[in-house]
Amino acid sequence: MDFSQLSGLLDGVKKEFSQLEEKNKDTIYTSKSGGGMVSVSFNGVGELVDLQIDDSLLEDKEAMQIYLMSALNDGYKSVEENRKNLAFSMLGNFAKL
């Protein structure tokens, strides 16, 4: 494989990655904690797109903080796991070439 072929291959990988990232923006990951009292939603690129807090938690700051941290951490882990899977998938496709 010469340099021009490698360059073309890398351009193809970049384009595929960009398309996957764009598609990933539309994927939503939702995590809940406290029996659903707190719900957070992230898109596939890790942006927080929704946050729901049950009104009963507004008077219990400590519980709200714990539930928020739990839901946020779980949501972030889901996004990161998806990103790892996409990366491995792309590497697998690259290795086949």
Swiss-Prot record:
Pfam families the UniProt entry points to: YbaB_DNA_bd
Record bears the keyword DNA-binding: yes
Keyword Isomerase: no
Gene Ontology terms, MF aspect: DNA binding
InterPro entries in UniProt: YbaB-like_sf (IPR036894), YbaB/EbfC (IPR004401)
Domain of life: Bacteria
Compartment(s) of residence: Cytoplasm, Nucleoid
Keyword set, alphabetical order: Cytoplasm, DNA-binding
Main location: cytoplasm
One term under GO cellular component: cytoplasm
Subunit-structure text: Homodimer.
Entry's family note: Belongs to the YbaB/EbfC family.
Function comment: Binds to DNA and alters its conformation. May be involved in regulation of gene expression, nucleoid organization and DNA protection.
Protein name stated in the entry: Nucleoid-associated protein Hac_0048
Organism: Helicobacter acinonychis (strain Sheeba)
